[in-house]
Amino acid sequence: MSMGLEITGTSLAVLGWLCTIVCCALPMWRVSAFIGSSIITAQITWEGLWMNCVVQSTGQMQCKMYDSLLALPQDLQAARALIVVSILLAAFGLLVALVGAQCTNCVQDETAKAKITIVAGVLFLLAALLTLVPVSWSANTIIRDFYNPLVPEAQKREMGAGLYVGWAAAALQLLGGALLCCSCPPRDKYAPTKILYSAPRSTGPGTGTGTAYDRKDYV
């Protein structure tokens, strides 16, 4: 695996990891849906994993942390845990990638470095899945409630910027992890030693080169 490809994969994975952190902290997973009577509302409601914010038409914003985890819907409760695990897993993957990087001397053996890099790629792939699942789940819940006639218009929400950042984070980590998984150990480490065998040449009487035994062997 070339060093350029390794650096590209690590950079994409790190960028996806940073986007996951932004997605976790951004209080814009759900935003107010401007439909029906809510079109003329004077405030916008944002809902995130840790707090909700109310933005007035004057530009003033007030945010409040959730009083209880049980007050959150199921998708946001699961998203809290999965996103945090994804961030920690990607951070561990970054440390593993640095250990197995070609530009570091933590490990001298090239075969071991390649295996460590593959492990880092797998960790980034798992982190991407842990980000993709809650983001897609929350988006599905928002769309389902939006078209549900039993849900009041005041409670309907639209997808916020946090979901799009989460999808971008998952895509970057998937791509970066896939590139790191392409790291293969050097083939010469596993190639069997080639031993060349040569068949003994026999000389017969009809070859004109002498008998089976050389004359010089006799006195």
Swiss-Prot record:
Signal peptide range in chain numbering: none
Claim: Transport is one of the keywords in the record: no
Main localisation: other
Annotated transmembrane regions: 9-29, 81-101, 116-136, 160-180
Gene3D superfamilies for the chain: 1.20.140.150
Extracellular side: 30-80, 137-159
Annotated positions of the Phosphotyrosine modification: 197
Coiled coil: none
Membrane-related topology note: Multi-pass membrane protein
Modified residues (Phosphoserine): 198
Keyword Cytoplasm: no
Annotated tissue distribution: Expressed in the lung. Expressed at high levels in the liver and at lower levels, in kidney and testis.
Record localization: Cell junction, Tight junction; Cell membrane
Cytoplasmic compartment residues: 1-8, 102-115, 181-219
GO cellular component annotations of the record: apicolateral plasma membrane; bicellular tight junction; cell-cell junction; lateral plasma membrane; membrane; plasma membrane; protein-containing complex; tight junction
Gene Ontology molecular function terms on file: cell-cell adhesion mediator activity; identical protein binding; structural molecule activity
Domain of life, source organism: Eukaryota
Keywords assigned: Cell junction, Cell membrane, Membrane, Phosphoprotein, Tight junction, Transmembrane, Transmembrane helix
Residue ranges, annotated region (Interactions with TJP1, TJP2 and TJP3): 218-219
Subunit and partners: Can form homo- and heteropolymers with other CLDN. Homopolymers interact with CLDN1 and CLDN2 homopolymers. Interacts in cis (within the same plasma membrane) with CLDN19. Directly interacts with TJP1/ZO-1, TJP2/ZO-2 and TJP3/ZO-3.
Known function: Plays a major role in tight junction-specific obliteration of the intercellular space, through calcium-independent cell-adhesion activity.
Similarity section: Belongs to the claudin family.
Name recorded for this polypeptide: Claudin-3
Species name: Mus musculus
Phylogenetic lineage: Eukaryota, Metazoa, Chordata, Craniata, Vertebrata
Gene field: Cldn3
